[in-house]
């Protein structure tokens, strides 16, 4: 009997020691519930977003642990490569006390209009991706780039009658940057302003010159007045856009045809190239870039500076890669909207066949002569220069296959209907 009691006491003592150790372990602050009780686990996804994965216990759940400190990312000064950020400015102005660098933030995504029927009877498969238009005497193809929403645009006005029986036709290709606000405004306003100003200048010039000068002198004065009217229309459009206080900008290449005269104007790096019957390409515009010597001197003479980063791209105030454009209020002191205009007499040069207007998404990969050759070849297989959109589509495809990542817009204008009979 005594022996049985001793054994029972020993068992109770052992159990007590085990329970005591267990209680000490549970009460210790070093004890971890991981793997024992289903507490929330936080996994960090890309961009600093938190994703909660729950493993719930059927019986009990401890409160979640304290949230980790917020992840703070450094602010980016401008949208360029690390190599370009490190590259020193090579301009002569850069070495001397230049103004502080201007920061132009990247544009937020902009909703793009849905596809539909083009007013010229063309087909718009998806405005955000591609546009194809076959209109009266012209064709167009546009392809969105891979970096952002489509920022190219175009405008066409045909059969605009003015006093004296003359008719005007206007064609334009536009390349926006910093969002769609500027390119949409320019596409809507510039053509109307150019046609209105040119018509008014023609009428006034004819009234003033009536009976006071020879026909040849009168014609020269009228041509000068039309050129001045185009300039005024560009500057007026720019002023109207700036008055809205909206950010962004746009480049342009436009053509006005009147009485057998072709007036081609541009700001920025949109380009116009003339194709002859003999297949010769002639550039009628010169790209406005900070790397152009006369543009650099103009900018520096007004207190600005230009620089070239590691990517080889020249920029105004370390920000903008074109030296003339609509909009761009932050650098307007140096980035003017003063157009350069070239005039070609279609009557005197009956060799003119077509005109190629395009954004720099084409010209960065396709040469002037290649563009003319492609249009001529496609026109030979189709019903004339503007008989289909094939010439424009082939040029856009050529630029894309060679690595162009920008928006590409190509317009081909048939000049033969404007030649004198």
Swiss-Prot record:
Q: Which residues bind Mn(2+) 2?
A: 175, 360, 406
Listed EC numbers: 3.1.3.16
- What is any one GO biological process for this UniProt entry? signal transduction
Please give the residue ranges the record annotates as the region Disordered: 46-69, 203-225
InterPro entries reported in the protein's UniProt record: PP2C, PP2C_BS, PPM-type-like_dom_sf, PPM-type_phosphatase-like_dom
GO-annotated molecular function: metal ion binding; protein serine/threonine phosphatase activity
Family annotation (Pfam families) = PP2C
Q: What is the lineage of its organism?
A: Eukaryota, Viridiplantae, Streptophyta, Embryophyta, Tracheophyta
- Annotated PPM-type phosphatase domain ranges read 137-415
Residue positions binding Mn(2+) 1 = 175-176
Return the cofactor note field.
Answer: Binds 2 magnesium or manganese ions per subunit.
Q: What organism does this protein naturally occur in?
A: Oryza sativa subsp. japonica (Rice)
Q: Could you say which protein family the record assigns here?
A: Belongs to the PP2C family.
Cofactor(s) needed, names only, are: Mg(2+); Mn(2+)
Catalytic activity reads: O-phospho-L-seryl-[protein] + H2O = L-seryl-[protein] + phosphate; O-phospho-L-threonyl-[protein] + H2O = L-threonyl-[protein] + phosphate
Question: SUPFAM superfamilies from the xrefs?
Answer: PP2C-like
Q: Which UniProt keywords apply?
A: Hydrolase, Magnesium, Manganese, Metal-binding, Protein phosphatase
Q: What is the protein's given name?
A: Probable protein phosphatase 2C 77
